């Protein structure tokens, strides 16, 4: 039995201060120009990372996730002065391989989930567009029960990824995207200043525990 989706729409919410719009835009870096396949099977993390790194190194701009394709990817990190823009019907899909997730947002505490899309000690980062970021949550679960999924056995290490983790970022905009199917927390903000979250949708499976929407 499928759980009801949880819809959480945020409209013009300002977190942690009055936020200006990051100075992104400018040059566009299409991730397919850096080798991304967008077939939903190939791990496109290296191509996405290359586009982000080049964009930031060149002074900033927009990293484009093109419309109508699914880009399966392992963890990657954001960079200063970069707007990650998801075109309509595009999707970033978390790699279901648990071994890909090795970094915890809680330093040495590896029992509270890992990071998938993340950034730390950055300036002017934004995630925009009407595409989707899909945490592929069921792939990290055990057996489906009537009202929940079993958690796979863990000791001091829980590989379930948080979808988006931002640590000590100065100026962040998250706008219009749909974030869905998280295996753990969805948006996790730690020590960030000047954050705007506007018009996003969070659609998580209620049978997956710890599927928080936004944790500050």
Which ranges hold each PLM region?
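Bacterial N-terminal signal peptides
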Residues: 7-17
């Amino acid at each position: 039995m499928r759980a009801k989706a949880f819809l959480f729409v945020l409209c013009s919410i300002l977190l942690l201060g009055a936020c200006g719009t990051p100075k992104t835009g400018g040059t566009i870096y299409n991730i397919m120009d850096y080798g991304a396949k967008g077939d939903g099977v190939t791990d496109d993390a290296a191509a996405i990372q290359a586009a982000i790194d080049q964009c930031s190194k060149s002074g900033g701009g927009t990293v484009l996730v093109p419309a109508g394709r699914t880009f399966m990817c392992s963890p990657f990190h954001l960079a200063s002065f970069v707007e990650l823009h998801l075109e309509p019907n595009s999707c970033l899909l978390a790699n279901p391989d648990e071994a890909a997730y090795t970094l915890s947002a809680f330093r040495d505490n590896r029992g509270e989930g890992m990071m998938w899309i993340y950034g730390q000690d950055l300036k002017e980062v934004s995630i925009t567009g009407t595409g989707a970021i899909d945490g592929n949550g069921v792939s990290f679960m055990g057996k489906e029960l009537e009202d929940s999924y079993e958690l796979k056995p863990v000791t001091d290490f829980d590989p379930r990824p948080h979808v988006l983790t931002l640590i000590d970022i100065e100026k962040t905009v998250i706008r219009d995207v749909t974030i869905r199917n998280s295996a753990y927390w969805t948006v996790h903000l730690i020590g960030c200043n000047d954050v705007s979250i506007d018009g996003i949708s969070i659609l998580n499976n209620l049978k997956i525990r710890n599927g928080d929407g936004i944790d500050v």
